[in-house]
């Protein structure tokens, strides 16, 4: 019975060889290539910070303005509108506003409009979107072509769901 049982009682245990940071231990062979320490003056640092701040301000000022409007009875549309606003803030200068708090005269100035609304009952408008609905229906035409998107929430159990 010549079974190879050398590994029968072999126990594996983890062991790591930690390498020291090479930038701390490296010795340059050529002294000309030896790294010299760069010192940054406080004045130079402030200039760099101010320059980057002006670049960021100009980039943020050029972003397209976006408004997310919501109307809700239960709060679900408000939650989704806030999530949408968070995502839109990565690319746009975005804000979220309830329909009843929205200044309707700003509609012509909007470049991008997202509407998140639910329907209540058989396709009826939520209470805080009623005034926006009336103003929108009384509007004859918009001089500025507003780009918009509507996300409607409702139940298919009603024959006129999302009719608002």
Curated annotation (Swiss-Prot):
Keywords: Calmodulin-binding, Cytoplasm, FAD, Flavoprotein, FMN, Heme, Iron, Metal-binding, NADP, Oxidoreductase. (6R)-L-erythro-5,6,7,8-tetrahydrobiopterin binds at residue 3. The keyword Cytoplasm applies. Heme b binds at residue 18. FMN binds at residues 72-74, 76-77, 118-119, 155, 162. It catalyses: 2 L-arginine + 3 NADPH + 4 O2 + H(+) = 2 L-citrulline + 2 nitric oxide + 3 NADP(+) + 4 H2O. The keyword Phosphoprotein does not apply. It is an enzyme of class 1 (oxidoreductase). PROSITE patterns: FLAVODOXIN_LIKE. One of its GO terms (cellular component) is cytosol. Binds 1 FAD. It is found in: Cytoplasm, Cytosol. Induction: By lipopolysaccharide (LPS). Its EC number is 1.14.13.39. SUPFAM superfamilies: Flavoproteins, Nitric oxide (NO) synthase oxygenase domain. GO terms for biological process: nitric oxide biosynthetic process; peptidyl-cysteine S-nitrosylation. Residues 42-62 are annotated as: Calmodulin-binding. InterPro entries: Flavdoxin-like, Flavodoxin/NO_synth, Flavoprotein-like_sf, NOS, NOS_N_sf. Belongs to the NOS family. Produces nitric oxide (NO) which is a messenger molecule with diverse functions throughout the body. In macrophages, NO mediates tumoricidal and bactericidal actions. Also has nitrosylase activity and mediates cysteine S-nitrosylation of cytoplasmic target proteins such COX2. This is Nitric oxide synthase, inducible.
